[in-house]
Swiss-Prot record:
HAMAP family: NrdI (MF_00128)
Protein family (similarity comment): Belongs to the NrdI family.
Gene name, Swiss-Prot/TrEMBL: nrdI
InterPro entries listed in its UniProt record: Flavoprotein-like_sf, RNR_Ib_NrdI_bac, RNR_NrdI
The protein's name: Protein NrdI
GO BP: protein modification process
Pfam families on file: Flavodoxin_NdrI
Function comment: Probably involved in ribonucleotide reductase function.
């Protein structure tokens, strides 16, 4: 188990209310964006441009790609735009879970942005997928989100 992966106690998990809502960051490669479009849920994209800001006022799960060099190089794994978004206390307060993408070529740092955010925010890491994700990943994430919002 990676040192950044923690077990979130079920009695501390704040369950989301309302409808499924996702917030995500996708670079200009649009890998995460394409995955989000397949989910068919209301969503909000964190801007690539650091000068732009977005704000939320309802519960969401954040989708984050991983940026790092693999191995022990985890510095910069969470995109700066995501950090900026979460540095806003109100934005941070509505986060209920994390889903991360990454590249399995990076071994034990695969999708490490997920465990990092889960630990920092004390919210569950719900799923990790590789790059663009597969159709099976899309189905799995839809099932996870539907269940997470209902229970």
């Amino acid at each position: 188990m990676h040192e950044d992966l923690i077990k979130v106690s079920s009695n501390t998990i704040k369950k989301p209310t309302g409808q499924v809502f996702v917030v995500y960051f996708s670079s200009i490669s649009n890998n995460t964006h394409r995955f989000i479009q397949k989910l068919n849920y209301e969503n909000l994209r964190i801007p690539v441009n650091m000068e732009e800001s977005v704000f939320v006022d309802k519960d969401y799960v954040i989708f984050v790609p991983t940026y790092s060099g693999g191995g022990e190089f985890t510095q910069g794994a969470v995109p700066k735009q995501v950090i900026k978004f979460l540095n806003n206390e109100k934005n941070r307060s509505f986060c209920r879970g994390v889903i991360a993408s990454g590249n399995t070529n990076f071994g034990n740092t695969f999708a490490i942005a997920g465990p990092i955010l889960s630990k920092k925010l004390n919210v569950p890491l719900l799923y990790q997928f590789e790059l663009l994700g597969t159709s099976e990943d899309v189905k799995n994430v839809q099932n996870i989100l539907e269940t997470f919002w209902k229970t």
